[in-house]
Structure formats: C-alpha cells, structure tokens
A protein has these predicted regions:
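Intrinsically disordered, low-complexity peptide-like regions
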Residues: 12, 40-42, 246
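N-terminal Lys/Arg-rich, disordered targeting/topogenic segments
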Residues: 1-11
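Membrane-embedded alpha-helical bundles that constitute the cytochrome b-like, heme-associated redox core
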Residues: 13-14, 52-61, 197, 266-270
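Polybasic, low-complexity association/targeting segments
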Residues: 68-117, 244
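Hydrophobic single-pass membrane-insertion segments
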Residues: 28-39, 231-234
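Domain-level detector of nuclease and nuclease-like folds
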Residues: 109-271
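N-terminal, intrinsically disordered, polar/charged segments of Gram-positive cell-envelope systems
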Residues: 33-89
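Hydrophobic membrane-insertion alpha-helices, especially the h-region
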Residues: 15-29
Length: 271
C-alpha cells in the first residue's frame, strides 16, 4: 500500500511539473509574440511616417542659402541638392495649398507648399490688379519696372485655391492679392527666371500629373527684401523633379536688402 501511494504521489508530481512547464512555455511564447507585434507595429508606424512626411527645404539649407552673396556676372540661379527635390511625392493626399503665416516682420519667410493637379491650371484672363505691398516694396517709376509682387505659388497653377488653401470649384481664378503668397521680387527674377520653373509645373499638370510644389523666399536676418527664392517640385509619377535657388537680382541695379531700396549700377550683370 505504501509503495502504491508513493507511486501515485510521484505520478501526480510529475504531471504537475509537466503542466507547469507547458504553461511557462505558453506564456513565454505569448510574450515573445506580443513583443514581436509591438516591434512590427512600431516599425510600420515609422515606415508610415517616412512615407507621409512632407520633406522639402530644411532649416539648415535655408540658412546656407541665406549666406550666399550674388556676384556680378553670375548665373541667375543655381541647383540645390544637385537639382533634385527633397519633397516626398507620397505626401500628396488632397488638392490644397499650405500657406505659412507671416513672420513677426510680416514677411513670407517660410515655405508655401502646394499639392496640385490639372484643375489648378488657371485662366490668365481672370487676373486682376495687384495692390498688396509686401515687405521691401518700393513703387516703380515709368519706364523702370524693377519691382514685382512675386508669387510663391504662381497664379497660373493655383486655380480654385482660396486664401485658406482649400480647393473651391466656384473659384475659377488663381491666387491673387494674398499677403501670405507674395514677396518683393525683381522683375528679372520673376519674369525671366522663375517663370521657367512655373512653366515646368504647368506642363506637368496638363499631362495629368499630380505635383508637390514648394516655394520658400530666403531672407537674411531681419532684412525686408528676400535674397532669393528656393523652388522645388516633384511629380508623383517621377516625371518632374527640380530644386533650384533663384537670386533676387536685376541687371543694372543693386539692392539694399535691408530696406529693398534700389540704386542704378550699369555694370551689374546677370547671366
């Protein structure tokens, strides 16, 4: 009887030990799976953030561009990042424009970023007279048009976008007289140079491309007139990709960027 009792106790003990081991293994496996799921979740979140991040001009790049001095005879624009945009094409989610607020000096010193499509190509006949005077603005004299109200996001590619940045199908015009989208720009930089890249964007939109387009006037310190403007764009299908810095200069004139005041300089050349 004693032997049978011991055998039963040993059997029960062995069964309990085995059961404890099985439970421990099960719990451990669940913990590992839970950790794996958490890790995978974090990785997916990081990947999603990387895919949806806007990109574009960084603060460090802004400061580097602000330090550049134009020299007579230099080209009107230079490539940035070897001409490749740092915008993320996957950030295009809806047709809109993000208009940055004016800074404490009432300057458009931050990036405006547009998410554009074909319907944003504007009808030129709907333009109206501009009256906003951005910082650094000085009136033009007859026969001497050197100042322009430069758009960050061009009128020609902003049809239907209201001043809040939302698309309104009732608004057939492009952006006009929006203080958050204008800066004092030279006629040469605006009409001869910036238009080159605005045309590229417009052509891409007419091909039914979706385009992320960013424009950032570059100011040095507390100066009221921008030293230049960074333009970059990328199409979601990869057919458009540029990144340039346009100097805010005018042949035959030099500017005090602190005030925007111009003085004649016949030998001042821009290529």
């Amino acid at each position: 009887m004693a032997r049978n009792s011991r055998r039963k106790q040993n059997t029960i003990g062995n069964l309990l030990t085995a059961l404890i081991v099985i439970i421990a293994i099960f719990l451990g496996a669940n913990k590992v799976n839970s950790n794996r799921q958490l890790t995978n979740s974090n990785q997916n979140q990081t990947q999603t953030q990387q895919k949806t991040g806007l990109g574009g001009l960084s603060q460090a790049e802004y400061q580097q561009l602000a330090k550049l001095d134009f020299k007579s005879g230099q080209a009107a624009y230079i490539q940035v990042n070897r001409g490749k945009s740092t915008l993320n094409p996957q950030a295009w989610q809806e047709n809109k424009v993000i208009y940055a607020n004016l800074d404490k000096l009432n300057r458009t010193s931050a990036s405006n970023t547009a998410f554009l499509e074909r319907r944003n190509v504007a009808n030129d006949s709907l333009r109206v007279r501009q009256y906003v005077e951005p910082t650094g603005w000085h009136g033009n004299h007859p026969g001497r048009e050197i100042y322009n109200r430069g758009h960050l996001i061009a009128y020609s590619v902003s049809a239907g976008i209201d001043q809040s940045g939302k698309y309104n199908p009732q608004n057939k015009s492009g952006d006009q007289n929006n203080p958050k989208n204008l800066f004092t720009q030279t006629a040469y930089a605006n009409q001869r140079v910036q238009t080159i890249f605005e045309t590229k964007v417009r052509q891409a939109l007419r091909r039914d491309c979706k385009v992320v387009y960013q424009a950032t006037p570059i100011f040095r310190g507390n100066e009221l007139m921008a030293r230049g403007i960074n333009l970059q764009a990328v199409a979601t299908d990869g057919s458009l990709n540029f990144n340039v810095y346009i100097f805010n200069v005018q042949p035959g004139y030099q500017f005090s960027y602190a005030t925007g005041q111009a003085q004649t300089s016949p030998g001042w050349q821009v290529k």
